[in-house]
Amino acid sequence: MEWKITDGLTDYDAAVAFMEARAAAIAAGEAEECIWLLEHPPLYTAGTSARPADLTDPDRFPVYESKRGGQYTYHGPGQRVVYVMLDVGKRGHDVRRFVEQLEEWVIAALAEFNIRGEIRPGRVGVWVRREDKPLTLGGQPAEDKIAAIGIRLRKWVSFHGISINVEPDLSHFSGIVPCGITEYGVTSLVDLGLPVTMGDVDVALRQSFERVFGAD
């Protein structure tokens, strides 16, 4: 397993090209699995289920058509993007379980900072309750999304992956309806009052990976 960390901001098209090539090499038995930690410049990506109406400000940032699952999401500075090039075939050929493991991995990493991340039926990603915010219009406790998940598989090897909000400009999410969900907001570790660095998050991800996926 290679853990790859890239400083600075990585061009989106270049990242996709790397992932596609690496996934093909993994499927061919020519490369080891790879977890790639990086940040992108501000941009929006549209997953395979994206609705045009959910792109509310199409001129704000570059928009990329992504072949990952899911709807619209934002990437930008202060957000840890985690691209997972893993052999799902040798991990059981169970895509649903693999997505659950990605969610469990994020939840385990957040727990290192005493943040309780939760999953919700019908809402892929990881959520945190906001007791400090008013109830929703439906009278439910407010919840904000702290991490998004969207993957693609080719020959049973995954690519794309996870984005965790560490300290992004949350106003940048206002140009889309994130993941097609209007009732809930977005948050970050810093927004929750934690002085967490990207390096802290990387350590938490590395430490919690083996607990979820087994030894790398």
UniProtKB/Swiss-Prot annotation:
- Originating species: Ruegeria pomeroyi (strain ATCC 700808 / DSM 15171 / DSS-3) (Silicibacter pomeroyi)
- Residues the record marks as active site: C179 (acyl-thioester intermediate)
List, alphabetically, the PANTHER family matched.
LIPOYLTRANSFERASE 2, MITOCHONDRIAL-RELATED (PTHR10993:SF7), OCTANOYLTRANSFERASE (PTHR10993)
Which annotated residues bind substrate? Answer: R68, G69, G70, Q71, Y72, T73, Y74, H75, A148, I149, G150, G161, I162, S163
Name the keywords, alphabetized.
Acyltransferase, Cytoplasm, Transferase
Q: Name one GO molecular function term.
A: lipoyl(octanoyl) transferase activity
GO BP terms, alphabetized: protein modification process
Miscellaneous section:
In the reaction, the free carboxyl group of octanoic acid is attached via an amide linkage to the epsilon-amino group of a specific lysine residue of lipoyl domains of lipoate-dependent enzymes.
Q: What does this protein do?
A: Catalyzes the transfer of endogenously produced octanoic acid from octanoyl-acyl-carrier-protein onto the lipoyl domains of lipoate-dependent enzymes. Lipoyl-ACP can also act as a substrate although octanoyl-ACP is likely to be the physiological substrate.
| Lineage: superkingdom | Bacteria
Q: What are the subcellular locations of this protein?
A: Cytoplasm
Gene Ontology cellular-component terms for this entry are: cytoplasm
The name under which this protein is listed is Octanoyltransferase
Q: What Enzyme Commission number does this protein have? A: 2.3.1.181
